UniProtKB/Swiss-Prot annotation:
Protein name as annotated: Decorin
Subunit structure, interactors included: Binds to type I and type II collagen, to fibronectin and TGF-beta. Forms a ternary complex with MFAP2 and ELN.
Organism: Gallus gallus
Signal peptide coordinates: 1-16
Prodomain residues: 17-30
Phylogenetic classification of the source organism: Eukaryota, Metazoa, Chordata, Craniata, Vertebrata
Coiled-coil zones: none
PROSITE patterns: LRR
Cysteine-cysteine disulfides: 52-58, 56-65, 311-344
Positions annotated as glycosylated: 46, 209, 260
Keywords: Disulfide bond, Extracellular matrix, Glycoprotein, Leucine-rich repeat, Proteoglycan, Repeat, Secreted, Signal
Length: 357
């Protein structure tokens, strides 16, 4: 009789549909009727493994607790967690001990909460954390004592008004830094704040109130995005030392001049975005630049194009040909431009002119 009863109890388990994960955030079991399961106030226990916080989904060391209206970080998170997703909740504070025992965590997603305070010791246990996403919160400053293992920090759409050098000290592994859409001013960026970030390759400080290129940017930088700010001019000092820079975004500012020699400081530049500014002429130095391929100058006040503005005086001195030059929505008339001004551009479709109103 006991054997029959045991067989009856085990039969549903044997016939259960297997879970097939299709992607990193695919946590739903494709099983008909699974949505009819009654919720429980008890934590979910999977086999003999760690407890999964109530209402969260746990699989393959990924813990997803997003879109649950949480007001604090769940307790008793599985210690083997490598990715913790807490986005789209109502968390206001990150406290010391919230991430205790999560020594294997690689990615922490805290996007779109109401976080205004982070304890200086909150991230202390996270010795292996590589990606920290803090965007769309209420932070006034970046937290101190961020893990030295970090490679990516994203904190756009906060209330950050200061960037202190001490915050970035020791963050030698950071490659990506995103700080756009914050009430940040040039005076709020401490001189040399980013110098200690020896591997920093990508930085975006767009849609803020800065009026100049931050000083002391590391030479490792390959992409610098400063679009949508209040920068009025580019001087040579602002680009000094950026010998590895390949992409520079300065669109939607108020730039009226680019100092002579500025582009000499970025010898490996390939893309220059200066559209939607107040330029009255093509920046000097483009003709002599060997590697630049894309130049966006549309929506400015350029009234004339010089014969040597884009191409060098001699032939075969430019190592890379242009793949895109945009000049539309400028006062210059296309019939006033000498054809030889584009003599180093092999594809006619690479040049866009006209449509000025």
């Amino acid at each position: 009789m006991r054997l029959v009863l045991l067989f009856v109890l085990l039969l549903p388990v044997c016939l259960a549909t297997r879970f097939h994960q299709k992607g990193l955030f695919d946590f739903m079991i494709e099983d008909e009727g699974s949505a009819d399961m009654a919720p429980t106030d008890d934590p979910v226990i999977s086999g003999f493994g760690p407890v999964c916080p109530f209402r969260c989904q746990c699989h393959l060391r990924v813990v997803q607790c997003s879109d649950l209206g949480l007001e604090r970080v769940p307790k008793d998170l599985p210690p083997d967690t490598t990715l913790l997703d807490l986005q789209n909740n109502k968390i206001t504070e990150i406290k010391e001990g919230d991430f205790k025992n999560l020594k294997n965590l690689h990615a922490l997603i805290l996007v779109n909460n109401k976080i205004s305070k982070i304890s200086p010791a909150a991230f202390a246990p996270l010795k292996k954390l590589e990606r920290l996403y803090l965007s769309k919160n209420n932070l006034k400053e970046l937290p101190e004592n961020m893990p030295k293992s970090l490679q990516e920090i994203r904190a756009h759409e906060n209330e950050i008004s200061k960037l202190r050098k001490a915050v970035f000290n020791g963050l030698n592994q950071v490659i990506v830094l995103e700080l756009g859409t914050n009430p940040l001013k040039s005076s709020g960026i401490e001189n040399g704040a980013f110098q200690g970030m020896k591997r920093l390759s990508y930085i975006r400080i767009a849609d803020t109130n800065i009026t100049s290129i931050p000083k002391g940017l590391p030479p490792s930088l390959t992409e610098l995005h400063l679009d949508g700010n209040k920068i009025s001019k580019i001087d040579a000092e602002g680009l000094s030392g950026l010998t590895n820079l390949a992409k520079l975004g300065l669109s939607f500012n108020s730039i009226s001049s680019v100092e002579n020699g500025s582009l000499n400081n970025v010898p490996h530049l390939r893309e220059l975005h200066l559209n939607n500014n107040e330029l009255v002429r093509v920046p000097s130095g483009l003709g002599e630049h060997k590697y630049i391929q894309v130049v966006y100058l549309h929506n400015n006040k350029i009234a004339s194009i010089g014969i040597n503005d884009f191409c060098p005086l001699g032939y075969n001195t430019k190592k890379a040909t242009y793949s895109g030059v945009s000049l539309f929505s400028n006062p210059v008339q296309y019939w006033e431009i000498q054809p030889s001004a584009f003599r180093c551009i092999h594809e006619r479709s690479a040049v866009q002119i006209g449509n000025y109103k």
